[in-house]
Every structure is written in structure tokens, then in C-alpha cells.
Regions:
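Extracytoplasmic gate region of multi-pass secondary transporters
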Residues: 168-221
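C-terminal ends and interior cores of transmembrane alpha-helices
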Residues: 39-56, 245-257
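Helix-loop-helix hairpin linking two adjacent transmembrane segments in secondary transporters
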Residues: 90-91, 98-149
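Single conserved hydrophobic/aromatic residue that forms the stacking wall/gate
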Residues: 1-13
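Central cavity-lining transmembrane alpha-helices of secondary-active solute carriers
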Residues: 10, 14-23, 213-225
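Interfacial helix-cap and linker-helix signal at transmembrane-aqueous boundaries
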Residues: 24-25, 116-122, 196-197, 229-230, ...
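Intracellular juxtamembrane helix-capping segments at the cytosolic ends
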Residues: 75-88, 275-288
Length: 353
């Protein structure tokens, strides 16, 4: 499977998991759900090394394994943010941003260590690498049998139902912001290596590392920066400035013909989109009281839809313009523009409430 196709299929599964989680997470509890999520993630990675050879059709085996760890990943996406939001921290926005920075460090670590492993031991030994990565969710699942987990809602308090959330105007603005956060991020991230190779004429191996790696490192740095200094920074203003910087990065990618500056544009995009996803989660938690699991699950769903639709939109526009990927990225300016509009609308709705 092409990595982009595999990613899209994982997103489809995660969308369904996001919706399904609303019905059972509160029923079985966050601890059981977290352990289940890690077990599914580990099982999928382990089965990746076994099923393709056990089944008559290797592709079917690969697909089943991917589906299993995608379910685990989708559950984790829904669960981890509310668990951290419930922690008794002084500044929840800082904690949320720091949490999401580890998504980026995980991305960087997997790419670097896997590349190093394959360079030393050869790609034929990829199964051992998959088993090594499976140790992380196994260990984390064991930890979650012991760590204290604070309740998201006060005792006796009930979270809002989906119907109650749907009646709130502010909820729909937050959903739009999450969609734009995912789309702004993945519109460049998923096309970064192709941009480096086809549009900037950079060697494929270097392009695969330079584009996505620079993007992930700066995205993680942005989140870690807010995680450290967030108590001194206005979140809404920081998100608006970041959306403007995102627009600048798209223009750099689309119109500057110098390859080095094009790669720099990809990196700047990572820096700019870093705060969008965790920032929207934090704004939602502060704006929608008693949102509970349903709020976080639906926001995760909107983010995943953005992660799928953003690069798809870029690809469609590029295809209509003679495969001009730069103009496809330029067309994605609509996402940070809508993000800015959403942030301003949230401020107005909060004053109205």
C-alpha cells in the first residue's frame, strides 16, 4: 500500500472509532478503555508480522492488522486528551499543548530509529522493528493498570449528550476549527516528501526525511514552547498569529522557486499548525461545560475528517491544474483563513453566553 492510501484507510477506521467511543467509554470507564486501546495498538503491530504469511492473501492479512492498530490509535486519540484535561494541573492549556507535542516526537523517533534500523540490519528484517515498536503500547497499557486517573466530570455530574451538543452554536464553530486544524496540518505534511521530490527536485531519500521530519520537529517545538510558556501567552491570539504564519508558509511553498526555501516553507508550516489542534481542544474544554467524552470524541472525529479531506482537497486541485502541487497547496489557504474566523466567532459567542 502507498503510505498515503494506508493513512487514508486508517483515518476512515479512526472516524468510526471516534463515533463508537461515545457509546461505551463512559460505560466501561477510562481506565478499561485506555488498557483496551493500548492492547489493540500492540496487537495490530504484532499481527502485522504474522497475518500476511498466515492468510492466503498477504494483502488481506496486512489490512486486518492495520485495522486493528488503527482502532487502538483511534481510541487513544479520543481518550488521552480528556484524561489529561481532567488532571489537577494549574494551567490545562499548557498541559494539553505539551501532551500533543509528544505526537510529534513520536513521529520523529519512529522515522529516525526505523531508518537507522533498516540501514544497519536491512529492510528485510522489518518484522523485528514492528515488534520493537509494539513494546511501547504494551508497557503503556501495563502502566495504565496502576496510574491514578482523575474523573473528567464531578461526582454526580452528567456529561452532555450528542443532541445537547448539537444545539450549541459554539460546538459547531469548534468542529469547524478542528476540521481546519487537521486539514491545515496534513495538507502539507502528507505531501511534504512529494513536494520535495517533484516540485523542489530533491533526492527522494533526503526529501522523505527533510520535508516531513522538519515539519514534525517544528510542530513539536511549537507545542512544547506553549507547554512551557503558555501561562504568559494569550491562547486565542497565539492561535490567530499561528494561522497567519501558516498562510505565509503556504505562500512560500507555492511561489518561491528556490528549493531550500520551499523546504523551509514546509518546516514553517509545521511550526504554525502546532498549536491549532491542542489549542482548539483547550478552547472547547473551557467553552463547553460538561462536554464530557462526547465533546472530545466528536472533536477528534472532526480533526480526523480534516486530516483526510485536507490532503485530498490539495490533490484534487493539483490534479485539475496539470498536477501542479504548489497551486494545490496555495488553494489550501482556505483552511487557516477559516481557522481565524472560527477563533473570532468563539470570542463573540463566549461574550454572548
Amino acid at each position: 500500500l502507498h503510505p498515503r492510501v494506508r493513512r487514508q484507510r486508517q483515518m476512515c477506521i479512526r472516524d468510526r472509532v471516534d463515533l463508537a467511543s461515545i457509546g461505551f467509554v463512559d460505560r466501561i470507564g477510562y481506565r478499561a478503555s485506555m488498557i483496551l486501546a493500548h492492547a489493540m495498538a500492540a496487537a495490530g503491530l504484532i499481527l502485522l508480522t504474522v497475518l500476511p504469511e498466515c492468510l492466503g492473501n498477504p494483502f488481506v492479512g496486512l489490512l486486518i492488522a492495520v485495522m486493528i492498530y488503527a482502532i487502538g490509535g483511534g481510541l487513544l486519540e479520543v481518550l488521552v486528551s480528556p484524561v489529561v484535561e481532567a488532571c489537577p494541573t494549574d494551567n490545562k492549556e499548557k498541559a494539553m499543548s505539551l501532551l500533543h507535542s509528544f505526537y510529534c516526537w513520536g513521529h520523529v523517533g519512529v522515522v529516525l530509529l526505523s531508518t537507522l534500523f533498516f540501514r544497519i540490519f536491512g529492510i528485510a528484517n522489518w518484522k523485528y522493528m514492528a515488534l520493537v515498536w509494539a513494546l511501547i503500547p504494551i508497557a503503556n497499557g501495563i502502566f495504565f493498570t496502576r496510574v491514578p486517573i482523575a474523573p473528567l466530570l464531578d461526582e454526580g455530574e452528567k456529561g452532555l449528550t450528542m443532541g445537547e451538543l448539537f444545539k450549541k452554536k459554539i460546538f459547531w464553530v469548534l468542529m469547524l476549527m478542528m476540521l481546519c486544524a487537521g486539514a491545515s496540518e496534513q495538507a502539507v505534511s502528507q505531501w511534504a516528501s512529494t513536494l520535495a521530490e517533484k516540485s523542489f527536485g530533491i533526492n527522494k531519500t533526503i526529501g522523505d526525511l527533510a520535508g516531513p521530519m522538519a515539519f514534525a520537529i517544528l510542530m513539536g517545538s511549537s507545542r512544547a514552547f506553549y507547554g512551557k510558556f503558555g501561562d504568559k501567552i494569550n491562547l486565542e491570539r497565539f492561535m490567530q498569529y499561528s494561522a497567519v504564519l501558516c498562510m505565509v508558509s503556504y505562500l512560500m511553498i507555492a511561489f518561491i522557486p528556490v528549493p531550500a526555501l520551499g523546504i523551509l516553507g514546509c518546516a514553517v508550516c509545521g511550526l504554525s499548525v502546532g498549536i491549532m489542534w491542542p489549542g482548539t481542544f483547550s478552547m472547547a474544554a473551557a467553552s463547553v461545560k460538561r462536554g464530557g467524552t462526547a465533546l472530545f470524541a466528536l472533536l477528534a472525529l472532526a480533526g480526523d475528517v480534516g486530516c483526510s479531506s485536507g490532503p485530498t482537497y490539495v490533490g484534487m486541485i493539483s490534479g485539475a491544474l496539470n498536477d501542479n502541487l504548489k497551486l494545490g497547496i496555495f488553494a489550501a489557504l482556505i483552511f487557516p483563513v477559516l481557522m481565524i474566523m472560527g477563533i473570532k466567532m468563539i470570542g463573540s459567542l463566549q461574550k454572548y453566553d
